[in-house]
Amino acid sequence: MIDSKDLATLLSLLDESDKPFETIATTFYRTFSKNDHFKVGCAIYTIIKDGFIRIPSQRLIGFYILFSLYKPDSSILSSNSLSSSSILTPSSTTTTTTTEHNNSNNNTSSPSFSSSTVPTNTTLQQNTPSSTSQAISPSSSTSSTSTSSYTNTTTNTTIPSSSPTSTTNTIIENVNDYPIAFNPFLPIFIDELEKQIDSSISSPLFNPIEKQILPLFLTNLPKDFSKKTPKEIINIGMNNTANTTTTTTTTTTTATTNITLPNISISKSSLKEYKNFYLERLPNHCFPSFRSIGISQNILFQLPSTTTTTTNTPTATTTTNTTINTQQSNPSLNTIKNHDINSEELSFFSFEPRFKRAEPPSFNPTTWINPSINHGLLLSNPMSSTVAATIAATATSAPTTILIPSPTTTTSYNSKKIVRDLMTKAIKGRLKKSQILQIKNEMDIDPKLAYYSGLTPKNLPFLVENNTQVAIDTLLKLINSPDFKDHFQTLISMEMNFRSMEVVNALATVDLPPHFIPMYITNCIDSCNNIKDKAMQQRSVRLVCVFIQSLIRNNIINIKNLFCEVQTFCLEFSKIREAISLFKAINDNNNTNNTNTNTNTNNSNTTNTNNNNNNNNNNNNNNNNLINIGEENPNLIIMATK
C-alpha cells in the first residue's frame, strides 16, 4: 500500500498529540501529494481497523485525517454532482413537517419550518430545538417524549441526538449536516462506534473517548474542535464523561479550553438507521477518487418501501402536522424493521461489483505465459545422420548383415528436435554429463544442427552461466554464421566472470576477427575499474591478469595494440601480485619483440651483402670464360661484337 518511508512519516505524524488538529492536517497535506491521499487514507484505515495503534490520541488524529480528506467545500456542495436534488431524492414517499415552537425565554411563539426528506423505513418524532441558545439543556424540551438537541456552532444548525428512552430516531436530511456521508472511509467510523456500543466498560476494547467523539464525526464537529490538540479533547471528554449524570444530551464547557462538546448517546438501532441512510444515498453519488481508478458504483441497495399517511394531531401547547406510519394502525406491525447489513457491504470492496469467475482448470494455467518449447518447422530426412553413420560403420565390417531400420524407427528419431529440446533445458538449468555429450556428438556429426538449436543472443548469457561447455561447442559451430557477431557482442556486454572468460579463451583458439579479443579485454578492464566493492574488485583484477597472461603465453594476441592500456591497468593495481606479474610479462614480451626486430634487420643486411658479393664473382667468372672462348675462336668474338 505505502512504502516503509511513508509509513514512518505517517506514524511520526500520528504522534504529534501536542499540536492542533488543523496543524496536523496541514502538515499531512504538505507531506503527501494529492494523488497519494487515498492510498495513505487506506493505510490509516487498515492500522485503525486491525488495532495496530491503541493510543487514544493517535486514533483521534487518524480519525480526523480520514474525516478531513473528503470534507466537502461549499463550492462542491453547490455543484450539480452534489446538489441536494440529486443526492437527497430517494425512491420513497416524501413528506413535509411543520412545527410551531414556544419560546420559553420571551414567552412568544415563533414558527419554525423544516422541510426534509424522510426514508421510508423511519418515522418522524416531535423535536423542540431552540434557535437562540448554543447548548440546550434537558429542561428546554416541551414534551417528555421529545428528543433533546444541541446547536452545532460550526454551521448554526440544530442537530438532534438520540435518547435511550426514545423509540424512534430522527435523521436530518441535509447534506450540510452530514459531510461525512460522502466519505469513502465512513465504514471505519461506524464499525468502531459499533464496537464501543457492544463492548462493556471492563472490556479492553472499550474507549469512552471514542464513544463520545465518533458521533460528532458522524454528524458535525464543534466550531473550535480543529483548533484544539488531541490531549485537550481527551481531557474534555474525560471531564464530560465524569460530569454526565443523565442519558439526555448535555453540553460540557471547560474553563481552560472554552469549547463545548455535546454528549451524544447513539444506540445500536439508531446506528443501523444511519447505515440505511448512508446506503440509500450511496448509488446517487459519484466518488471522484473511486471513479478515477476505474471502480464504478453499480451496486444498488434495495430496501422495501412503505406507504405513509398524514394526520393532524392538535395539542394544548403546539399544533403539529406529523407523519404517522401505517404500521401504527396495526399493533402487530408497530415496529421498525431492522434490515441486517453485512460488514462486507460497508467495506472498501462494496464499491466494486463482484463478478462470478469460472473455476480454474485442473492444469497449471501459467504454462502458456513462458513456453519452454521453441516452435518451428523441423524437417527430418528419411534416415537421420546418426542412423546413417551406424549403417555406414556396419557396412564396412559386415556388408551382408545390414539391417535397414523400419520407417517407424527412422521417423521417431529426430536429431533436430533432440538438440532443440536439450538446448532449451540447458538455457534454464544445468544438464547432466550424458546430455552434454549427446549435444556434442549430434553437432559433431551434423554441425548444421547448431543453427536449429534455438540459441539466440538473448539466451546466450543464461547458457554461459548454466552450461559453459555447451555454449563453447555451440559457438564454435556458429563461428561462420552471419549472426556470430551478435553472439560475441552479447558475450562482451554480459557480466564479466570466470565462465565468460572461459568461453572467450576457447573461442580464441580459432580464427576470429582481430578486434574481438582486444574489445573483450578493454571491457574487462573497464568492468574492474567500475566495481565499488574492494574485495570484489581485487578478485576481478586477479582474474583478468591471469586471463591476459594466458593469451600472451599462447601467442593469441599481440600486446603491442594494448600495451599502453594494459600497462596503465597494471600500474593502477600495482599492489596486487598478479598485476605485477602481468606488468613484467608485457615488458619482457615487448623487449623480446624489439630484439627480434633488430636481429631480423641485421640478418637482412648481411644477406644483401652476400648477394652482392656473389653477383660480382659471377660477373668475373663470366668475363674469364669469354676470354678463354675468344682465344680459341676469334670469329665468335667478332660475331658477338656485331
UniProtKB/Swiss-Prot annotation:
Biased amino acid composition, Low complexity: 589-625
Cellular localization per UniProt: Cytoplasm; Nucleus
Source organism, top-level taxon: Eukaryota
Region (Disordered): 78-167, 589-627
Gene Ontology annotations for the cellular component aspect, listed alphabetically: CCR4-NOT complex; cytoplasm; nucleus
Disruption phenotype: No obvious phenotypic change is observed.
Keyword Lyase on entry: no
UniProt keyword annotations, A-Z: Cytoplasm, Nucleus, RNA-mediated gene silencing, Transcription, Transcription regulation
Keyword flag Lipoprotein: no
UniProt cross-references to InterPro entries, sorted A to Z: CNOT11
One GO term of the biological process aspect: regulatory ncRNA-mediated gene silencing
Subunit structure: Component of the CCR4-NOT complex.
Family recorded in the similarity comment: Belongs to the CNOT11 family.
Function: Component of the CCR4-NOT complex which is one of the major cellular mRNA deadenylases and is linked to various cellular processes including bulk mRNA degradation, miRNA-mediated repression, translational repression during translational initiation and general transcription regulation. Additional complex functions may be a consequence of its influence on mRNA expression.
Official protein name in the record: CCR4-NOT transcription complex subunit 11
The organism of origin for this protein: Dictyostelium discoideum (Social amoeba)
Biological classification of the source: Eukaryota, Amoebozoa, Evosea, Eumycetozoa, Dictyostelia
